[in-house]
Swiss-Prot record:
Belongs to the non-disulfide-bridged peptide (NDBP) superfamily. Long chain multifunctional peptide (group 2) family. Signal peptide: none annotated. One of its GO terms (biological process) is hemolysis in another organism. Expressed by the venom gland. Its main location: secreted. It is found in: Secreted; Target cell membrane. This is Pandinin-1. It comes from Pandinus imperator.
Length: 44
């Protein structure tokens, strides 16, 4: 329905907004570093 369409488009806007993009990048980097530490490798 209409409400669902609105929710989806709002979620898409939020998901691709700048603060969220930066946050996603930080989380990805943290995860990569964590895994690298666990397996004893340096992230590239």
């Amino acid at each position: 329905g209409k409400v669902w369409d609105w929710i989806k488009s709002a979620a898409k806007k939020i998901w691709s907004s700048e603060p969220v993009s930066q946050l996603k990048g930080q989380v990805l980097n943290a995860a990569k570093n964590y895994v690298a530490e666990k397996i004893g490798a340096t992230p590239t």
